[in-house]
Regions:
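Conserved C-terminal helix/tail region of periplasmic/extracytoplasmic solute-binding proteins
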Residues: 240-271
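Short amphipathic alpha-helical segments at helix boundaries and their inter-helical linkers
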Residues: 120-122, 218-232, 263-271
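Secondary-structure end/capping motifs
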Residues: 168-247
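A generic short alpha-helical patch detector that favors 3-5-residue windows
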Residues: 79, 151-154, 206, 227
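Pocket-lining segment of extracytoplasmic ligand-binding domains
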Residues: 32, 111-202
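Short polybasic/polar patches that bind polyanions
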Residues: 38, 92, 135, 200-201, ...
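Short, glycine-/small- and polar/acidic-enriched structural segments
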Residues: 1-108, 115-118, 122-128, 139, ...
Length: 271
């Protein structure tokens, strides 16, 4: 890709394609869904945890917890996507078999949030600005808030990962990317109004108020405190339990992470 350019990929399949073709050097991606791709041999190195708590599990009012999803319809763009993987892990922790006990409704043409708002599905995993919209419209309620509820609040949801060969061959550039990402994360804490306006100006959301709410609700201040390796181990174990990865957590950690750049940036930025 040209220097300084960016692209948006909406699925794990496109992510894998982008890495394989050399179109992507770095991605900020949901932690859990990275691991099945790594387990299948995708050359990714995870270099930092970025933030915690960007997803919320919305459900109809009669569903009071994850266990109540048994036999209910749950929307996702596709099997193997981030929401499908996260909800599968949640379900397995309360004794459900996500492959058998949940009725997955997949749609590439209609967003799950729209199906939920129309009452066509019972639950879905929302990401900003979807939760902010649903709260404003008083649609459904949250049964899992990853910013507040354990164990999800104890682990990163989004992590910075790089093309393995790029990271190996370009340590100086990799460190610059890590530093830039974490300084931007700090800016979300120190200058939320400025960041919210830039999010709107760049077309990521038309609603300034939703952007402000997101910056207030998502914990962007945890990257100094949390050990990102804990996140990799947690999701590797959980995904192995539901059959989405074959490797054990120790092997995934050994093959996948490089915290040198994060540790250097922590010392430079304080933390």
């Amino acid at each position: 890709m040209p220097k300084g350019s960016q692209t948006s990929l909406t699925s794990n399949l496109m992510l894998a394609w982008g890495y394989a073709n050399g179109d992507i050097d770095f991605t900020m991606h949901f932690s859990g869904p990275l691991l099945p791709e790594i387990d299948r041999g995708l050359g990714i190195t995870v270099v930092a945890g970025v933030h915690v708590g960007c997803f919320e599990l919305f459900a109809k009012e009669d569903i009071r917890g994850v266990a109540d999803l048994k036999g209910r319809t749950v929307g996702t763009l596709g099997l193997g996507t981030g929401p499908h993987i996260f909800i599968s892990v949640m379900a397995s922790l309360v004794g459900l078999d996500p492959a058998k006990d949940i009725v997955w409704v997949t749609s590439e043409k209609v967003e799950p949030v729209e199906l939920f708002a129309e009452g066509k599905i019972d639950a879905f995993l929302g990401f900003p600005p979807e939760p902010q919209r649903l709260r404003a419209q008083k649609i459904g309620h949250v049964i899992v808030n990853s910013a507040l509820d354990r164990p999800w609040s104890q682990y990163f949801c989004c992590m910075l990962a790089g093309n393995r060969e790029f990271v190996r061959k370009n340590p100086v550039a990799t460190k610059r990317v890590v530093r830039a990402m974490l300084r931007a994360t700090d800016l979300c804490v120190s200058e939320p109004a400025l960041v919210a306006q830039r999010v709107v100006d760049r077309g990521f959301t038309p609603r300034h108020d939703y952007a402000v709410q997101t910056l207030a609700e998502v914990p962007y201040n945890r990257w100094r405190d949390y050990d990102p390796e804990d996140t990799i181990r947690f999701y590797a174990l959980r995904l192995r339990e539901v059959g989405m990865v074959k490797s054990n957590p120790a092997k995934i950690v050994a093959d996948t992470v490089d915290w040198r750049f994060l540790n250097e940036v922590r010392r430079e930025l304080g933390g």
